[in-house]
Amino acid sequence: VRGLGTLKLNSTKEYVEKYTEEFYLVDLYYRRTLEAYHELITKENPIEQTLSDAKRQLDLEYAKITNVLNLEWLTCVEEKGAWFTETGLKRQEDFYKNESDTSVKQVVIVCDALRYEVAKELMQELAKEKHIATIDAYQAMLPTETKYCKSALLPHHSLELNGTDMMVDGTLLTTTEQRTAHLGKYREGAICTRYEDVMNGDAQSMRELFKRPLVYIFYDTIDEAGHSQSPFEVISACRKAIEQLTVLVKRLHATWNVTNVLLTADHGFLYTYEEFREDDKVAQEGF
């Protein structure tokens, strides 16, 4: 943390570049340290109190640096005004347009709440298997919620709000069947499915599934853990996601003959082991 240098930068683009290159490590190391801490305290340990004290100090240090970084970011946003167009990032709603390739068979894995630092670790795991793995950042839609952002990852001509619902080409897409019907309008034979159905499917049906030109697989493990009352559930779910998605990508390549795999997220998440207080929140006026 002390090696990060200044947290006050001159533009939103600089913040994005700095986060994707270096600042993300603060989130990654915090998560990994909590993971190690939980493994130690679940066993009888003579230094449990010492570990607990060290972990408490870690929580305070993490909260401090993320709070300072967030305040500097918000100051930059307020000063720049039209910050949303100046980050240098591709936009989430253009994902299909940017990444779709009709010349090859593709699988898109949409991982709910896969934040950037977890994706970086996943990429490192995939690289161990001699995959050619690269990572790129996209700018999520606001508000960054599943019901808005997940729909934006599908092909579309229009995205419109109807009350609090996101309409895709004038239609509400909340089920796998609805998403499949919609996807098929843009790519004949394309289909949407769930991770559980893929991993639990029989060999013959999976071979047939991945003969299709485009398959969207929806994976929800991290987001589901975020609704738990246990603060460690999210940390555990991140590790589970890295392991399960590594296995899935390996099977796609080796068993189902899919060479072009895209893995993306609808949104990320904010996390601290300590509970958020009211004074941790920022008023939404002006955003």
Where are these regions (language model features)?
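Feature captures the catalytic ectodomains and active-site-proximal regions of enzymes
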Residues: 1-287
